[in-house]
Amino acid sequence: MSTLQDFQIAPAILHRVTVRDASAILFCTLLTVFLFISQGTVRGVKRVGKSRLRTLVTGETPLRFDLEKYGYLGYQQFSKKANKPFLVKIYGLDHYVLPVKYLDSLKTVDHHRLSFAQSLNDFLNVDASLGDLVTHSDMEIAVVTKHLNPRLTTLTPVLVDEANFAFEKELGKLETWKTVNALFLSAFLTNRTSGRVLVGDLCRDDNYLHAMMKYTESVFSSGVAFNGIPLGPFRKIVYYLGARQHRRDLDNAAALVLPEIKRRMAAQAEDPNCRKENDAIQWNLDLPLASPKEGLPLRHAHRVLHLSFAATGTVAILITHMIYNVLMYPEYLEPLREEVMACTKAHGGWTEKAMNEMWKLDSFIRETLRVQPPSVFTAYRTVKNQPFTFPDGFTLPVGSRITFPTLPVGLDPENYESASEFDGFRFFRKREEARLAKKAYNWGATKIDSSFLPFGYGNQACPGRFFGVRKTKILFGKLINDYDFSWAEPRSARPENIVIEGQILVNPTPEIKIKSRVAAGM
């Protein structure tokens, strides 16, 4: 339905109104059209979805909760059939959803032309709480690429140690069945384990843990709260006013990080050769400053907390998806356990070599991401500084937002055999085939290609995926090795996901029964 059709007014009403009334109606109609209709879209690109007014009038599911459906429709009708973009509102903003033929441009074009940070800032309204933190510099990315990723091998024992503490703290030795919420368990395990690398010893301070989790949980809810309202030019001010509680959560968490940041800054000022910790707080302090304000203690605190948001939420959701999958497909549980036990026994525990040989677990992670990716769409970018032209001549004006159809691509039968079915060892078999044929294996859980986009694509793909997959292996591997678990209540179907603004969120309500395994070996 055309958006203009949503604003038709019955002639029977019009002939009874005065000139003043008509002027008021005309003004309100024009204002509403201004707010409801996107400006400056590229001619010839078709829109999918439904207007906000239509869903209000008809009672249909609003588009922001129905993007899985319209992502598929647009993919089939435009991306696949015509190899063309389509337009859809995501996060209340127009996005061009591009066919995969345009992915290669993301490999070479830098963030000054096509910016993921600008997209993130705009669709989650990050500036309502953190100002220009994610757009002013790439220091947050540099913490991951220049410090975290090169240290992952040496950080493995640290992660394992903290995972052991997290399991002891959250579960301990359970001789009888205990009922827990699956997502809450995953979230606490993930946040405790991640925290050791992000904030060092502060991770074991429960006051900090709860304050940080309250902040990270409100990033998404605060960032999308008003997207169902056509705010137009008032979007930023409305989100700023609406984010007061979120900013309070941020302040509370920052107040617990700031003393440690200030202590270290003072120690380094007194003695540049002083002992340094091996965590994200220190890596922030060691980075060259993009500008003087990036060196302020509060700015460092905000960067650490935003990194915590990025490092924990998606991993907790992924682990919960994996719990649901292994309960719905129990035939995978024992082979996964056997692999974990064999690898840890052969290599003396959760070592780098042990994890590198957990091929079935790696496959299970990748298949979960294929079927239940973090979002219907990924590889978001915003055109900056000047119009951007793709190799085939398709041109987008400055300010245009693009993305790619991750879930439809992952479930496309042209990309995967029996694509709609969950096959936990799909990529393990590919690995075995490659090994027997003496060919390179390109289907590891962190490997990105044009048919696997959960981590984005190109030179701004998720740099934290290596850290995320490593934590997932440790936490899920220890969970299945050390504990038995089942649904708290019998289920015949997998809990339905919740999709908001294209984000695929795990159903937060299911509970599981859990107890220690008698045969647990590690």
Curated annotation (Swiss-Prot):
Entry keyword Oxidoreductase:
yes
Q: Name one GO cellular component term.
A: membrane
Compartments, as annotated in UniProt: Membrane
Q: Which cofactor does it need?
A: heme
Q: Where does heme bind?
A: 462
Glycosylation, residue list: 191
Which EC numbers characterise this protein's activity in its record? 1.-.-.-
- GO MF annotation, one: monooxygenase activity
Which top EC class is named for this enzyme in its record?
oxidoreductase
Q: Which keywords fit this entry according to its UniProt record?
A: Glycoprotein, Heme, Iron, Membrane, Metal-binding, Monooxygenase, Oxidoreductase, Transmembrane, Transmembrane helix, Virulence
State whether keyword Iron applies. Answer: yes
**The organism sits in which domain of life?**
Eukaryota
Which pathway does this polypeptide act in? Mycotoxin biosynthesis
InterPro entries referenced in this protein's UniProt entry, alphabetically: Cyt_P450 (IPR001128), Cyt_P450_E_grp-IV (IPR002403), Cyt_P450_sf (IPR036396)
Major site of localization recorded for this protein: membrane
Annotated function: Cytochrome P450 monooxygenase; part of the gene cluster that mediates the biosynthesis of sirodesmin PL, an epipolythiodioxopiperazine (ETP) characterized by a disulfide bridged cyclic dipeptide and that acts as a phytotoxin which is involved in the blackleg didease of canola. SirD catalyzes the O-prenylation of L-tyrosine (L-Tyr) in the presence of dimethylallyl diphosphate (DMAPP) to yield 4-O-dimethylallyl-L-Tyr, and therefore represents probably the first pathway-specific enzyme in the biosynthesis of sirodesmin PL.
Q: What is this protein called?
A: Cytochrome P450 monooxygenase sirB
Organism field: Leptosphaeria maculans
